[in-house]
Amino acid sequence: MSSQPSKDLETFENPQPGRDYTIRIRVPEFTCLCPKTGQPDFATLFLDYVPRARCVELKSLKLYVWAFRDQGAFHEKVTNEILNDLVAATDPNFMRLTAEFNVRGGVYTTVVAEHRHPDWQPPVPVTLP
C-alpha cells in the first residue's frame, strides 16, 4: 500500500458478519479547500457504522482523507461525497458520518449524513436500570 493520498478505499471481510456491532472511527485532521476563497477548511470526522460483509481498512481511509487536502468543496458536498464513497466500498447495514468543521468567520458548521441498508432492521435498544 502506498503512502500517497489516494481515493482508493480498501476493505476486508467483516470478522463477525452475523452480529450487529458498531465501529467508531475519529479522523481529527481532515482538510479541504473552501471553493469560494481557496482557504483551507479543517474538520474532525466521526464515522459510525454497522458493517455487513466488509469493513474499511484504516490506512486506506487515512490516505483517502488526505486526498481532499487540495480539493475545493462545500462542507455539505464533501461530507456526502465521503459517505457515498464509504457506502460504495463497504455496503454497510448503517453508516453515519459527522463532519465538525472548525470555526470560519465566527461560524461553526457540523454536517451529519446517514445511510441505512434497505434490508436492515436495527436491534431494539437495551435500556439498563
From Swiss-Prot:
Q: Which residues bind substrate?
A: 56-58, 75-76
Q: Which terms does the UniProt entry file under GO BP?
A: queuosine biosynthetic process; tRNA modification
Major subcellular location class: cytoplasm
Record localization = Cytoplasm
Its pathway?
tRNA modification; tRNA-queuosine biosynthesis
Q: Would the keyword Cell membrane turn up in this protein's UniProt record?
A: no
* InterPro entries registered for this protein in UniProt: GTP-CH-I_C/QueF (IPR043133), NADPH_dep_7-cyano-7-deazaG_red (IPR050084), QueF (IPR029500), QueF_type1 (IPR016856)
Family membership = Belongs to the GTP cyclohydrolase I family. QueF type 1 subfamily.
What is the designated name of this protein?
Answer: NADPH-dependent 7-cyano-7-deazaguanine reductase
Q: Which organism is it from?
A: Thioalkalivibrio sulfidiphilus (strain HL-EbGR7)
Tell me the lineage of the source organism: Bacteria, Pseudomonadati, Pseudomonadota, Gammaproteobacteria, Chromatiales
Gene name, Swiss-Prot/TrEMBL = queF
